[in-house]
Amino acid sequence: MYEKIPGLINRSETVAYVGKIENVVGMSIEASGGRASIGDLVMIYNEEQNSQTPAEVVGFKDGKVQLMTYESTSGIASGSFVRNTRQRLKVPVGDFLRGRIINAAGEPIDGKGPFEASRYYTVNSVYTNPLNRPPIREKLEFGIKAIDGLNTIGKGQRIGIFAGSGVGKSTLMGMIARNVKTDINVIALVGERGREVLEFVEKDLGEEGMKRSVLVVATSDQPAMLRMKCPLVATTIAEYFRDQGHDVLLMMDSLTRYAMAQREIGLAIGEPPIARGYTPSIYAELPKLLDAVQKGLFEKALAFRNEHVKTVTNMEELGEAVQNGFALGMWCGD
């Protein structure tokens, strides 16, 4: 009981920073008043539904605070009150995550009940000194002969799969999750259709793969903020298990949809479109995500694998940027 007290104190609010909504245009919300920093979580009072809508501070413009919500903007009105929690997005961490499916806000969606968490990790990409990352020396066994025999992968290595739709990427992910010689798998499904999520869990992953996996899901019908946060939350959870001394395999499907969500956010807050409509922030955020998790100096190795859905024959600027992030390996498929 007493060990929970420091966490409760840290999450308590002693000062309230309150503003009000000025403009709502599409996904972008502008508020005035109060104090805020980039990344702060705010709660917007929804009078229509008598509830609070969570949002995040993503920018500032003309003296106003720009917000993006984690939920629908339905019911948010001009003049609605906004309260800054002075907190960042945090996810509950612990062994209770094994075999569970959560959304990009860290909330369970599998119907198995809420978490009783006493520890939280902040979702944030922190720069790591490259000299603290030892070279890759140890082989990781995937339990798949075609990979272990012809495409040997080391612990801490990053692998990208560049392929079009319908070639069996999800099937391969399920095979890897069931057979890989790691302690736990963390899988991020970004922008998937709802039907595909259930099919992946039941058909591709199966009971054997699910019991030692954690799924972080943000479907295509959810706001761009959740889709953008999905791989970051998965990375944070993977870092937790790595810190506990476990070997972890992190898989993401897909980086393209992560970049598309980042593009939606960038365009909504006024970033200029550049190559193929992508905004400059994408080319700053992609390297942070790709380089976020590797082998630590004192931690167990973390095998890192990303999935990028683009045909190799039509590789454009985004694909080239991702390829540069996968300097250690890439798989291609038609």
What are the roles of these predicted feature ranges?
Residues M1-F142:
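Acidic-enriched and Gly/Ser
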Residues S80-V82, L89, F96, I109-R158, ...:
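P-loop NTPase nucleotide-binding/switch module
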Residues G149-L150, G156-D334:
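P-loop NTPase catalytic core
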Residues K4, S12, N84, R133-I136, ...:
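A near-ubiquitous, low-amplitude feature marking generic local secondary-structure context
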